[in-house]
Amino acid sequence: LKKNPNKQYLGYGYYHNLRYSFHYRDQIYAGITAEKDAGEPFFTGQNKKGYDFYSLYLLIRNIGHIKTLALGNYRVSYGYGLVINTDFGMGKTATLSTLGNKSRGIRKHSSTDEYNYFQGMAVSYKLAKRWTLDGFYSYRKMDGIVDNQFIRSLKKDGYHRLYREFEKKNTLTNQLVGSNLNYNGKYCELGLTAVYNVFNKPLNPEKKYYNIYYPRGKDFYNVGGDYKFFWKRFSLLGETAIDKCGTWATMNMLRYSPKGGTQLIVMNRYYDAKYQSVYARSIGEGSTVQNESGFYIGLETSILKYIKMTCYGDFFYFPWKKYLVSKAGTKGLDGLLQLSYSPTYELEMFIRYRYKKKEKDFTAADKTKQTIPSIQQKCRYQLNYSVKDKLTLKTIADYVRINFRGQSASNGFLVSQSAAYTFHLLPLQLDLSAAWFNTDDYNSRLTIYEKSVLYAFSMPSFYYKGMRRSEER
């Protein structure tokens, strides 16, 4: 182990966390969250303080003109995420009724996420009946790879299980200050957000063909304006933002909501390849608000009694190269069709088909490389059934098929069953789940939602062949 310190975890292989929360009415929230990932030391070795991650927060609401006051760890999100967004989102697979919802301002950070939060103070002040002004400041240590006084990359997973992971812990600092001015009118909502953040060392990733336009430098600032207009059953919403170099990103959406729960959405987005915002996150095919344009159209409606149809098509284009895509100017398509059946409150089932086509690098048998379309097809059947609010059952059957054009396909199957039972006479809930999976390789892996301890969940991926079971109390 001394010769090869990165081949064995420094701690035991169990995961656990501790949460304490207190709230008084809807005005005061306070709490602490502590977490140790599997493999991290606990009160030993490199970690003498017990848990690897601690999060303390205090949130006060509706005290005079102060709508929200946050101390300690908190989250902020404004507009539609082109400037700053620390929310967890389901992206394009969210229901159309929630897709494009405006972000929620200042909130407490009570989760175990070790990256998407800020540390300091944030306040929301009610200037007038329809006007609100927010301000926030953060100073925090962050994980990353620092080499020759440059920050080569930010480490976002929060793992500190090996020596090489501990070497990246708290190696840099980031300060952030920002504000948001919001108007909430009868027929419109308007917002203006400005954020400035600075690292203690310049951010300078090692240059690759795909990261030429990644954020570089010591300081960054962004300004964005968001809007939402209402007229009868129509709403027009969006946001436009610029960075310190004058490069811009914009997202605009038209929503039509007639009677009967129908939603029709048309959305256009343009994220310049050179746009830089460290904390931006919005709707898109990529994971960053950069190097993407697209057109999205979606429909959610009832076609028969108890049967609802959801479908969308997203056409996207990447003007510059991406990771594992060495060709500039690639494009793709993401389409979904889902039929849901819910005759009663206790029973719901749906079947979903998703098709995605995008260009990726492929190495042929003769070692020649080319960028060709990769096609992924997914099918899911899910049944949810509850009995008198005591027992909840969920059955899932998944299938995935992925292949490059003209090449053999990789297939994957997964079947899972979960059950949750609530004891009404005791403050106790029992959750059981089991899954069987069989895939050809890692490319055809399958992911499912899995409940964890209270207020926590995970989304593990499964590949090759095996079974998994879990039990939570």
Locate each region found by the language model.
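Surface-exposed loop/turn segments flanking beta-strands in extracellular/periplasmic regions
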Residues: 90-101, 147-163, 451-456
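Long C-terminal interaction/binding lobes of large macromolecular proteins
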Residues: 79, 89-91, 105, 118, ...
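Outer-membrane beta-barrel proteins
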Residues: 35-53, 107-114, 167-170, 241-243, ...
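Hydrophobic, small-residue-rich alpha-helical packing segments that form membrane-like cores
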Residues: 119, 127, 137-204
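Exposed, low-structure sequence patches enriched in small/polar residues
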Residues: 5-15, 172-205, 212-473
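Outer membrane beta-barrel
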Residues: 48-106, 110-143, 258-277, 426-442
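Outer-membrane beta-barrel translocator/receptor signature
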Residues: 3-18, 22-30, 34-40, 46-54, ...
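N-terminal periplasmic/intermembrane-space "pro-region" immediately following the signal or transit peptide
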Residues: 1-3, 129
